[in-house]
């Protein structure tokens, strides 16, 4: 996957390209990240990238010319058909379904806003989709862009050692993840559930599914409203609820 970044602070993306799973993906050639700074396209000595909004009001907007030129440069450098995304609080809220949809694209350009945002005409003419990571405001689009890259890159074949890791994560099947345990077997008097040490793969699968359903019911019940549960899932959830109420 190729990702083009348009940002006033491209150095921030070193946390994506140099570290962790995404850093390894870059080293393996599975993920390529390039950046364009609108300051490099400014025409004045001060490299100005902000401008006053029409109608007055507090704050500034990103200047049209440097931003548009940076976007055009990123588009020209793209190796193929590219989806252009503007990270914005007004965009579609990113969730697991959205992540999987975006992962189908081979090339993405992510525009990171600053100040009070960008000229609406830039969005209308240059942007394919707007995405948000939540109903809150940040100082810029860089962290949302990094969040998007991190989540989408997990679905690039070869990025994760075991692709099942992505398929079994929270929200991958519409449910929260089940509890996980590692050594020691006993920690502060609390033991690892016996079923996980049994070696019975079917029992372990059912236990994990039950815990996943139960955790979703307890913490995010609204997620269950959008799911068509199988007979097995209905049975396991009923068992979990009964067990919880008898504790």
From Swiss-Prot:
GO terms for biological process: tRNA N1-guanine methylation. Its main location: cytoplasm. S-adenosyl-L-methionine binds at residues 113, 133-138. The keyword Transferase applies. One of its GO terms (cellular component) is cytosol. Keywords: Cytoplasm, Methyltransferase, S-adenosyl-L-methionine, Transferase, tRNA processing. It catalyses: guanosine(37) in tRNA + S-adenosyl-L-methionine = N(1)-methylguanosine(37) in tRNA + S-adenosyl-L-homocysteine + H(+). SUPFAM superfamilies: alpha/beta knot. It is found in: Cytoplasm. Its EC number is 2.1.1.228. One of its GO terms (molecular function) is tRNA (guanine(37)-N1)-methyltransferase activity. Pfam families: tRNA_m1G_MT. Specifically methylates guanosine-37 in various tRNAs. Homodimer. Belongs to the RNA methyltransferase TrmD family. This is tRNA (guanine-N(1)-)-methyltransferase. It comes from Vibrio cholerae serotype O1 (strain ATCC 39315 / El Tor Inaba N16961).
């Amino acid at each position: 996957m190729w990702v083009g970044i348009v940002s006033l602070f491209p150095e921030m993306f070193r946390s994506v390209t140099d570290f962790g799973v995404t850093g390894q993906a870059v080293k393996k050639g599975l993920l390529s990240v390039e950046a364009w700074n609108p300051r490099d396209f400014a025409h004045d000595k001060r490299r100005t990238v902000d401008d006053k909004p029409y109608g007055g009001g507090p704050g500034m907007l990103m200047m049209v010319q440097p931003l548009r030129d940076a976007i055009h440069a990123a588009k020209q450098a793209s190796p193929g058909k590219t989806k252009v995304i503007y990270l914005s609080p007004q965009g579609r809220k990113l969730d697991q379904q959205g992540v999987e949809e975006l992962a189908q694209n081979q090339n993405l350009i992510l525009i990171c806003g600053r100040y009070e945002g960008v000229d609406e005409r830039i969005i209308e003419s240059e942007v394919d989709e707007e995405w948000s990571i939540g109903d809150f405001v940040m100082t810029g689009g860089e962290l949302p862009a990094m969040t998007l890259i991190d989540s989408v890159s997990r679905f690039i074949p070869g990025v994760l050692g075991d692709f099942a890791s992505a398929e079994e994560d929270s929200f991958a099947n519409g449910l929260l993840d089940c509890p996980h345990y590692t050594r020691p077997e006993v920690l502060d008097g609390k033991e690892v559930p016996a079923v996980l040490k049994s070696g019975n793969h079917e029992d372990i699968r059912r236990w994990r599914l039950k815990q996943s359903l139960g955790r979703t019911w307890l913490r995010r019940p609204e997620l269950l409203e959008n799911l068509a549960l199988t007979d097995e899932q209905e049975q396991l959830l009923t068992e979990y609820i009964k067990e919880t109420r008898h504790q």
